[in-house]
Each structure stands twice: as structure tokens, then as C-alpha cells.
Amino acid sequence: MKLKIGISPCPNDTFIFHALLKNLIDMGTFEFETTFADVQSLNEGAQAGDFDIVKISYGNLWNVQDRYGLLYSGGAMGYGCGPLLLSTKSNSLDPDIPVGVPGKNTTANALLRFWATGESVTYETEYAVFDKLYHDLLNADRIQSLVIHENRFTYEQDGLHLICDLGEYWEKKTEAPIPLGGIVIRR
């Protein structure tokens, strides 16, 4: 039986699926067709039912829970690892300049909405692939943006300004770990 798997190229996903994808464990009659994509594309693929097993944003789980069940392993939750809202200009959000967001159904976008609602902040969004957003800031093609992953450790060196650590904001308001993403399987 061939199963369609969708994961991102991030180290978490490739580590979790490494043994399976490299045939290091006996999977019997199961074969895998793997798609590597950014998380928004994976979220959309899950909504369309394109995959048998797929990594999604927890912010998208409610959109697919009728077709997919959440696996008990492989999820990403934690402290101190949420998305950052950064700017090339200042430490405050300019409501007249769109915020670059790595996808409509991403946890990063859900955390941005959570912060904006809690702080009564208004903003406009522009969606782009997550790995393009940071480069756009560095190249001055974008003024303010959400960034995820490793860039949280380098933004100050790169001359960018922190508007809000959305993960830290979530942790303070909820006293819960940041729900980033999980792996779901077709029901």
C-alpha cells in the first residue's frame, strides 16, 4: 500500500521521518510517496485531502479534524520557540504597512491574531513562503514580518527590531506551551 506523506524540510520533520523515508525500518507492504513543502502548502494540502499523513500547523487543526486524526507523536510544542514579529524600522507595529505572514492557516498567523486582539492592534497582512520573509526584511523588500525558526537567534545581528515575541506573549497570557504543529493521519 502506498501512502502519501507531506512534511516540511525543517530539521524537526526530517528527523522524525528519517528512518521511514530512508527505509531503515521494515514497513512491510507500505510504500511512501513524500512531498516536501512549506507549512502553508501542507496546511492547504491537508484541507484538500491530498495526503494520508501530513505535518500541519496546530492553527489549522480545526479545519481538518473531520478528515484527519492527530497522532500522539511528532508534534511540536514548547517554550521560547514561537514566531517573532520583526521590523526593519522600529520596535512598534506600523498599521499602515502590511505584515508579512507565512500563510493564512499557520500557527504563526493565529498567534499574530491572538496578540493583535489582546493588544487592540490593527494590521494588514501579506502572505509569503516562510523562508522568503526574513530575506525580504534583510533586502528591504518588506518592512515588518513574522519570522520563524532559526532567525529568532540572528535578527539583532542583522539589524532588525523586535516588535513582539509572539510565543512569549502566548506563554504569559495562557501559561501554556506554544502549540506549533502536529502530524495528522487520514481517518
Q: Language-model segments: which ranges?
A:
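Bilobed "Venus flytrap"/periplasmic-binding protein-like clamshell domains
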Residues: 2-22, 81-143, 148-150
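N-terminal hydrophobic or amphipathic helices and topogenic motifs
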Residues: 1-73
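Pocket-lining segment of extracytoplasmic ligand-binding domains
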Residues: 126-187
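Hydrophobic/proline-rich hinge and linker segments of small-molecule sensing/allosteric domains
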Residues: 70-92, 171-187
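Short loop/helix-cap segments at secondary-structure boundaries that form the rim of catalytic
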Residues: 63-65, 112, 154-158
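Short, well-ordered coil/turn elements that cap or connect secondary structure elements
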Residues: 27-29, 65, 80, 94, ...
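Short coil/turn connectors at secondary-structure junctions
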Residues: 30, 65-68, 93-97, 140-142, ...
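Conserved beta-strand segments of alpha/beta enzyme cores
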Residues: 31-33, 69, 121-124, 161-162
